[in-house]
Structure formats: C-alpha cells, structure tokens
Design a protein with these regions (language model features):
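Residues on the lipid-exposed face of transmembrane beta-strands in outer-membrane beta-barrel proteins
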Residues: 47-49, 68-74, 85-88, 153-163, ...
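Outer-membrane pore/translocation modules
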Residues: 31, 82-190, 195-205, 212-232
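Short glycine/proline- and aromatic-enriched beta-strand/turn motifs that initiate or cap beta-hairpins
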Residues: 23-78
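Surface-exposed strand-loop-strand hairpins of Gram-negative outer-membrane beta-barrel proteins
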Residues: 52-66, 115-117, 140-143, 266-269
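Cleavable N-terminal export/targeting peptides
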Residues: 1-39
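Predominantly the C-terminal beta-signal and adjacent terminal strand-loop region
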Residues: 244-289
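Outer-envelope beta-barrel architecture signal
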Residues: 37-45, 64-66, 75-77, 92-98, ...
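A conserved mid-domain beta-alpha-beta active-site/ligand-binding segment of alpha/beta enzyme cores
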Residues: 227-239, 245
Length: 289
C-alpha cells in the first residue's frame, strides 16, 4: 500500500505542478530539433509509408501511415505527444524532470483474433473500425493487457570534451495505475551528424513483474498453444535508431527513420512471441501547422 500511495502522490504532484506552471527556466530545453518555442503549442502531421513488425505469433505488421505530433513547452511544464512532465532543475548542460507516460507493450495485443493461420492483429483496429469476425476456433483466454501509466524521473545531459555532441538520457519509471508492480529503466545516447541525421543507441531494463504482466502466461491462460510461462527475472532490451529530418520550408519537411529493438531473453522466451526483435521503418513528409 505504501508503494502504491507513493506512486499516486508522484502522479498528483506532477499534475499539480503542471496546472500551477511555476515560473522558471524553459522546460525540456534539451529536446531534439525542431523544438517548440517556450510557451507555444506545435501541431504537426506526418504522412508517408511505414510499418512496424509485430513479434507475437501470427501477429500482422502494423502500418505507419499517419504520424501526428502535438507538443507544448512552457516555463517548467512540457507535453510531447504521449509524454508529460515538469522540469525540476537544470543548468547549461543538464536537466532533471518529473515524467508521466503510458506503456506501449499493450499495442501488440489490440484486437487479437484467432484465424486458421494462428493469431493476428485485426487490421480493422488500425483503421479504427470494429473487430472482424474470427474465422477459426475460439482463441484461448488471455487476460486484457491494459495500458499502464508510468511515472518517475528523467535526466538529460549534453556531454562535452571527448564526448562533445553526444546527448545522454536516463529514465527511471514505476507503474502508477496498479495493474502490476513493474519498473522500467531506460538509457540512451544520441548524436546528430551530417546536418539532417540523428543516431541513437539505447537499452531498456524491465523488471520481472513488468515482463510477466505483458508477456507471461498464467495457469488460467495456458493452453496447448501457449504453455504457462513466468520469467525468472527482469532483463535488458537493446535499441538502435536512425532518423532523417530535412526542412524544406517553415511548414514542410522530409522525415524518415528506422529502428530496431532486440528483446531481452526474459521477453523473447515467452511462448506468445515468435520473433525476438521488432523493427520499424518510415519515410514521408511532415507538415507543421
């Protein structure tokens, strides 16, 4: 109960500070360009061709055709799509933030249906329509994987000296919504190069409880298709990302990117998965309103 109370106090503190918008230095000043000017809202929409693979058994690739982005950076408060926070402290090269954001793992499980070829993501889910009728046997019961609210601290630093040009990001997050008692720690380094390019390397640690909630198989869920599975421990997943952004005018830019995530063995060993990694690709244009 004490840990749950601390988590909700953290969330309440963040929301309270967001509403108060206390005066101070600009929030999230170390964000990647193009950054929203202090006190301003920015809305952009990316249109193009892209996809993200689904690691679940029989999971269909997820199309990435429209990529909206809404951001706001105030004096201490910031909102960047699904991420909201309050800047607690900063100097010329470092920053500490209080952060709230949703989990993403549940997206793999949206509108699953069991067809003759196995499980697949219902393509109508991507288009925002109703669920298609299943064409095979009734799927084994899997509990609903909820979207979890994650909250915690973030540290950003622009490095100098031998590492000049590198940006470092660290996040420590706890589950706030009470679905599981998981924790996640994220590490990443990024660098701009060749004017329009940006490369990032990272690693995410997810605790045993976190992995078990999304990728474990409980006794009530076990079936001939999916044996019971509980991870023995947490694990580190590795990530690499390359992005391209070339402005053509104040309102238009070309954007592309590719990303690869290699799951930890604790995730990859789940009987729900048939792939131990996921990758995504996107190429298109972005319009800034």
């Amino acid at each position: 109960m004490r840990n749950l109370a601390v988590r909700y106090l953290l969330l309440i503190s963040l929301l309270g500070q967001s509403l108060a918008a206390a005066a101070g230095a600009p929030a999230k000043t170390l964000c990647q360009a193009p950054c929203t000017s202090e006190g301003g809202w920015e809305l952009s929409v990316g249109l193009g061709l892209g996809m993200s693979t689904n690691p679940l058994k029989g999971g269909s690739d997820i199309p990435l055709l429209v990529r909206p982005r809404l951001s706001y950076y105030g004096e201490r408060v910031f909102l960047d799509n699904y991420e909201a926070g309050v800047m607690l402290w900063e100097n010329s090269s470092q920053q500490i933030n209080l952060l709230v954001l949703p989990s993403l793992e549940q997206l793999y499980f949206r509108r699953w249906q069991y067809a003759s070829g196995g499980f697949s993501l219902d393509p109508d889910f991507i288009k925002g329509e109703g669920a298609a009728e299943s064409t095979g046997d009734k799927p084994p019961h899997l509990h609903h994987r909820h979207t979890s609210a994650l909250g915690g601290f973030e540290y950003n630093a622009s490095l100098g000296g031998f590492f000049d040009g590198l940006e470092f990001n660290w996040q420590f997050l706890e589950e706030l919504s009470g679905y599981h008692a998981g924790r996640e720690m994220r590490l990443a380094i990024s660098r701009d190069f060749l004017t329009y390019w940006r490369a990032s390397l990272g690693a995410n640690f997810q605790s045993r409880d976190y992995i078990n909630y999304y990728f474990g198989v409980s006794a009530s869920e076990a079936s001939p298709l999916f044996s019971r599975y509980t991870p023995n421990s947490g694990g580190w997943s590795k990530l690499v990302r390359v992005e391209y952004l070339k402005p053509l005018s104040p309102h238009l830019a070309i954007k592309g990117g590719a990303a690869l995530k290699i799951f930890s063995s604790a995730v990859a060993d789940s009987p729900l998965l048939e792939e131990s990694s996921v990758y995504s690709l996107f190429l298109g244009g972005v319009y800034y309103f």
